Design a protein with these regions (language model features):
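Catalytic strand-loop segment that frames the active site of acyl-thioester-processing enzymes
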Residues: 3-78
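HotDog/MaoC-like acyl-thioester-processing domains
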Residues: 3-36, 114-119, 123-167
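Generic structural detector for well-ordered beta-strands
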Residues: 38-42, 109, 160-162
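Sparse recognition of residues in long alpha-helices and their boundaries
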Residues: 67, 103, 133-134
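Hydrophobic beta-strand-centered segment that forms part of the acyl-chain substrate-binding groove
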Residues: 71-78, 85-128, 158
Length: 167
């Protein structure tokens, strides 16, 4: 079961998280420079194996427990494809409460692996905003990080989106 921890007291399944409407109210959503939003991530070994299979990543390091034990990682690690999917989905989930959104660019740097049964914090911060929502659209640039509980950066990311009044 994929778990996204919205806060310490509450855990919900990955699939249910993105169906929820109450993760953040419209009044809490902002496109101000410096605004950030975050979620906690905790994946089990079974989650990692299932997600790698679901996204078509057949690298043994994501599903073969025996072979992965003999690697520098010492066990199964999450697929970059799967992590980037979960992580990037935070952006439309956040912004779609206030405007229509189109993704324009996204890049990831995987600094360290995502291991099972460790809690990670995924966050995005708005770096710049340009344009007009009712005109050609607002271009929003974001930077993001995924960090472990010791604040070690596992993943760094950049994204550029467009917010529009209508699609």
């Amino acid at each position: 079961m994929y778990l996204l921890h919205v806060n310490v007291e509450e855990s919900i399944s990955y699939r249910d998280f993105f169906k929820r409407d109450n993760a953040m109210t419209n009044s809490e959503v902002s496109c101000a420079i410096g605004k950030s939003f975050s979620k906690d991530l905790l994946l089990t070994k079974e989650d990692i194996i299932e997600q790698a299979a679901f996204c078509g990543d057949e690298n043994f390091i994501h599903h073969d427990e025996d072979r992965s034990l003999n690697t520098r990682f010492g066990g199964v690690i999450a697929s970059g494809s799967a992590i980037s999917s979960i992580y990037s989905a935070m952006i439309p989930t956040y912004f779609s409460k206030i405007a229509n959104i189109l993704g324009l660019e996204m890049s990831f740097q995987f600094k360290a692996p995502i291991y099972p049964d460790i809690r990670y914090s995924m966050s995005w911060m708005i770096e710049s905003v340009a344009g007009d929502l009712n005109g050609t659209g607002k271009i929003v640039c974001l930077t993001g990080t995924i960090r472990d509980s010791e604040q070690k950066t596992q993943v760094m990311a950049q994204a550029k989106i467009m917010l529009l009044s209508t699609l």
